[in-house]
From Swiss-Prot:
It catalyses: uridine(38/39/40) in tRNA = pseudouridine(38/39/40) in tRNA. Its EC number is 5.4.99.12. GO terms for molecular function: pseudouridine synthase activity; RNA binding; tRNA pseudouridine(38-40) synthase activity. The active site is at D53. The keyword Lyase does not apply. Keywords: Isomerase, tRNA processing. Belongs to the tRNA pseudouridine synthase TruA family. Gene3D superfamilies: Pseudouridine synthase I, catalytic domain, C-terminal subdomain, Pseudouridine synthase I, catalytic domain, N-terminal subdomain. This is tRNA pseudouridine synthase A 1. Formation of pseudouridine at positions 38, 39 and 40 in the anticodon stem and loop of transfer RNAs. Substrate binds at Y111. One of its GO terms (biological process) is tRNA pseudouridine synthesis.
Length: 247
């Protein structure tokens, strides 16, 4: 058996998230459907670095699966991309040992969130950026960002629906990039709770709008209560950008 690692990109707009759900189109479902065809009807389960929500995009999602088929890496890439729909692309294929695990071997993840600063919607970017029509004080956002960096209990910044009991995570970097009429938030951490990036982005936008003080972030973290943080930003501005592994 070979263990195959794939780096996957997808446009999340027409998916109900990554993970298989009955009666809904998902990324995992489409990948496993393609693998089933390649394996002559045999079901092949894939493991992913993590789940993404409905409408969330990925540039660097990582999956693995085990297979009895002996194909070269380029053959896997070509075969899967031929069978997958246009909104999923296998960017890279690597053969790994059985010690590799797409989920349990993750060292850090990078997410990016795009915000379009415009009162007018952009018809070509509407599915890929969060259009924000209100003026923002960027310096206030920059002042708030360092409070999130480090190891914290992020209960205040995750969905109540999360199934994780341990809410402690480490954020290594948060960068605010100003690019033409967009601002891009770049997050690097050892892991992220359900909706965590989107809630932090929503909170930072509230800071930029003057609804929250930058220096209130430590208090919000300490309260460990979701109701004190800002609104959650929508899914379509979020990208799973890159996943790094221990080995």
């Amino acid at each position: 058996m070979d263990r195959i690692k794939c780096t996957v990109a997808y446009d999340g707009m027409h998916f109900c998230g990554y993970q298989i759900q009955p009666n809904h189109r998902t990324v995992q479902q489409e990948i496993e459907k393609a693998l089933q065809k390649l394996h002559k009807g045999e079901l092949v389960r894939v493991q992913a670095s993590g789940r993404t929500d409905s409408t969330v995009h990925a540039k660097g999602q990582v999956i693995h699966f085990d297979t009895p088929l002996s194909l070269e890496e380029w053959q896997w890439s070509n075969a899967l991309n031929t069978m997958l729909p246009d909104d999923i692309v296998i960017r890279q294929v690597e053969k790994k040992t059985e010690e590799f695990h797409a989920r349990y071997g993750v060292e850090k993840k990078e997410y990016r969130y795009r915000v379009l600063l415009s009162k007018t919607a952009d018809v070509f970017r509407r599915n890929y950026v969060y259009q924000y029509p209100y003026p923002l004080e960027i310096n206030s956002i920059r002042k708030a960002i360092p409070y999130f960096i480090g190891t914290h209990d992020f209960t205040s910044f995750c969905s109540a629906k999360t199934d994780k009991k341990d809410k402690v995570r480490t954020i290594y970097e948060i960068e605010l990039i100003e690019q033409d009429d967009e601002i891009i938030f770049r997050f690097v951490g050892n892991g992220f709770l359900y909706n965590m990036v989107r809630i932090i982005v929503g909170t930072l936008l509230s800071v930029g709008q003057g609804k929250l003080d930058p220096d209130s972030i430590p208090e919000i973290l300490a309260k460990q209560n979701r109701q004190f943080a800002g609104k959650m930003a929508p899914g379509h501005g979020l990208y799973l950008w890159e996943v790094n592994y221990n080995n």
